[in-house]
């Protein structure tokens, strides 16, 4: 495969690089092994976090967390709740549930990433048309002082959960298990 030929050269020249690929579906561990990438995007987890909070049915999320645990045996997935190709999480499930999605993202195994603007509670709906990404890819203001103060609580939550993550580096490869699972309630434990 192309990446298996190219990435060793990249890593030889840049030994501290960390390479991940955007993979929507497929055999994630096999793709990692054959490509020599360090990680890939964990779309299954993204979708199940969003869907569980949107429908208030946590069984899909529990199932995908079990799969996620299995992925962690082979590699550490790049996890997210928003990116450049999807409707923003605050638009999809509302700001309160977006905060819960962030809490899940930051308390399960993986390498979490934050899509720019999500830390400010940006909204935007992806549309299937020419220019349909424009709403989810807005221009940032010229300086932080120009940001709306409406995003301040979301920003502070991001700061707190990122700090939690930094204080607990074991979360990188933590395994997650259900403690209590019902349609509208899900308590889980992450351990390493």
Indicate where each model-derived feature is located:
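Active-site-proximal helices and loops of the catalytic beta/alpha 8
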Residues: 1-77, 95, 104, 123-160, ...
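Acidic/polar loop patches that form or flank catalytic/metal-binding clefts of enzymes
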Residues: 20-21, 111-118, 169-175
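Solvent-exposed loop/turn segments at secondary-structure junctions
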Residues: 25-27, 83-87, 120-122
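Short, solvent-exposed helix-loop connector elements
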Residues: 89-93
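Conserved interdomain hinge at the start of the Helicase C-terminal
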Residues: 98-100
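Conserved active-site segments centered on acidic
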Residues: 107
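Carbohydrate-binding surface patches
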Residues: 178-192
